[in-house]
């Protein structure tokens, strides 16, 4: 394993590399209240993952390999492809005018009609 450290006037630098199969390494430098650096390791799939970071008044920010590993991401995508999908939404139907029944008693309504002889133009309805 390699390791180094430097301190000077409130600033520092350090780093290490394990040099083994885990591939762990780290480098960092900083001053009072802030730091920048990176670290690396070999994950369970054999992939080297490296993260760069900074920390200071704006908080901790990491970039690089900060998500899930590619094997887990591929397995999740395969599972999502097998998941049931919602059926497509039906097309909206055209509006239909409502059917409003007519009131009883208007001419032409259902019922019985009797035409009385001798009374021209008169019909009784009941």
From Swiss-Prot:
It comes from the Eukaryota. GO terms for molecular function: structural constituent of chitin-based larval cuticle. This is Adult-specific rigid cuticular protein 12.4. One of its GO terms (cellular component) is chitin-based extracellular matrix. The keyword Protein biosynthesis does not apply. Disulfide bonds: none annotated. Component of the rigid cuticle of the spider. It holds the Pfam family Chitin_bind_4. Keywords: Cuticle. Residues 9-87 form the Chitin-binding type R&R domain.
